[in-house]
Amino acid sequence: SSRSKKRIALTAALDRLHGRGIQVATEVLTLLREGFADAAFSRWRTLHEISVVAMVLGDHGEDLAVRYLDHDLVEAQRAADVFQRCHPKEAAQRKNVAELRQTKAEYDAVVAHYGPAFKSPYGWAAKHLGKEKPTFQHLEEAADQAQMRLQYKVASYGVHAGTKGLTSSVADVFGEGPPGAASIGGLHEAGIETAYSLVRVAGPLLGPNWSVDKLAGLKTLIKLRDAAAKAFSQGGRAIGEATWVSEDEIEAWQKEAER
């Protein structure tokens, strides 16, 4: 139908985001099974980014989705710039010169079409968010997910090489720094957030026109999400209670060790 044709780019973008979201959620599950809570939380960070983009696209529709997909040309040029800077000899080869020229021509055309604000990492959202250089935090606010900023920040500790990643860990139930191996501690954090983010990724796919089947499907997803979140929460609480150690017990162990 003509209505469905108007959502070609939006459907394509949301389908791809959903597929990638499922893949990342599977990675989270794999890490949880192996006891790597920090790594799982870091992968959830990616899933959160995917879900936020999906929600923003779902809210703003086809025009923004076209811009989002066209922004691939900007990313291609950024990669080309790095290639030429880091591998000048290879970049100077005839085959690569032709490809680089084509990439630059497509980049120039898309920037001329959308304007200079399109050049920034999230430039595809500049017009719709009313920001010259939108950031991911702006996307979170647009998706009504600003309350997730703290979780996102904590999850980032395990991604980068900052000192916070060396001194704290969601897996450490004793609060004395990150464990040196897999642990059962902290697994519930990534599990709960992943369950919620998966529903956020799937929601925009249902589109603006709600049918009985779509409502039933969404209701089922929410029930599964709530059940998973409850199970993870109960597991985390049980682990916390089982691993809690009083100061008296610690002091007694220290005295025993000194003998």
Could you tell me what each predicted segment is?
Residues 27, 33-81:
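Long, hydrophobic, well-ordered secondary-structure blocks that form the structural core
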Residues 22, 41, 94-97:
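Short, amphipathic alpha-helical segments
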